[in-house]
Amino acid sequence: MLRVAVLSLHTSPLVQPGVGDGGGMNVYVRELVSALAHAGVDCTTYTRTWRDDLPAEVMIEPNHKVVHIPAGAIDMPKGDMISIVPHFTEGVLDHVNAHGGTDVIHANYWLSGLSGHSLKHELDVPLVSTFHTFARVKAEGGDPESEFREQSETEVIG
């Protein structure tokens, strides 16, 4: 059975859309992973622990579970999460290694892309990245992001 590690560092597919950073990406990740799970793909979505009362793992449906990785303060703003990417990455790596590995990584958003880029080299598996937004495109629309983000996206794309 194909095993996919789905990365969604800054927002969980369990978050209600419209709450905090919950929105289209949450719905996208949850629905994509659900479709893969129904097709017989073993999917684990890794997200940052976003509430104190969350279990370490939540089984959503057969072949689809969410794993909460403790990384940073519960109420950490998305703009500060670059600092926790290494800690999140280490937590994902530990879980993946403890549970038999993965065949492919699918990262969502640029922060998860940075984590996935490190993990693909550590685990020697392919990385698929869905950025959802790009710094370069946002800048063209008058909403500039950091130069670091743009450089990071370029590195992940390779």
PLM regions with names:
Residues M1-V58, P62-V66:
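N-terminal subdomain of nucleotide-sugar transferases
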